[in-house]
C-alpha cells in the first residue's frame, strides 16, 4: 500500500502569489488556502466541513453588505484519506479587478470573525440543515449505494462513518467550530493566490499577510 509514500507536506511559502491571465481586463480571482488535517478522525472532518458551509454563508453576507453585489464566493474543506495528516481549507472569490482590495478585506475579516467569536445558533442551523438533508438523501438513489459498494474494500469503514456522521453533525457546537477556526485558519498561515489580468497593475502590491 506504499505506506512510506503517504506523506505530503504543505508548502512553507505562506505568502501572497500573483498569477496573470489573458482574459477580460476586469476579472480577478482571490484564493486563500490553509493546511488542516487528514480525514481519519470523522468528528474533526465533519467540523471542518461544517466550518466550510458557515464560511460560505458568512462571506456571501459580508460581500453583499460591503460591496452591494451578490457575489458567490466559494469555500472548500478537503481532508485526505490517502495522505497522512494532510488536508486543506480554501476560500475563493471571483470579482471585478477594482474590488480586489475590498474583497480581500472582507475575506480576512470573515476569517478573523470566525476565530474571534462563536457563530450564532441560527447561522449554525443554516449551515447544518443542508448537510443533514444530504445524509438523508444519499441512499435514496442507486448512485449512493454504488458509491458504498465501489469502495467497500478500499474504505471498509465508509458505511460505519455514514451511520455515525449524522449524529456527530447534530452534536457540533458553535464553540467547537470557533476552536477549529482558531486551530487551522491562523493569521499569516495561508497561501494566497491572486489571479489578475495581464498588463493591469496589482491593486494589492503592499498587502499584509492573510
Residue ranges and their predicted role:
Residues 178-196:
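Bilobed periplasmic-binding protein-like "clamshell/Venus-flytrap" ligand-binding domains
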Residues 10-12, 48, 63:
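Extracellular/periplasmic bilobed ligand-binding domains
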Residues 18-19, 61, 77-79, 165-167, ...:
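Generic recognition of flexible, low-complexity loop/linker segments
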Residues 26-43, 64-171, 191-196, 203-206:
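M16 family metallopeptidases and their MPP-like homologs
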Residues 1-27, 36-37, 196-210:
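An aromatic/glycine/proline-enriched structural segment found at the starts
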Residues 32, 42-56:
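Active/ligand-binding-proximal structured segments within catalytic/core domains
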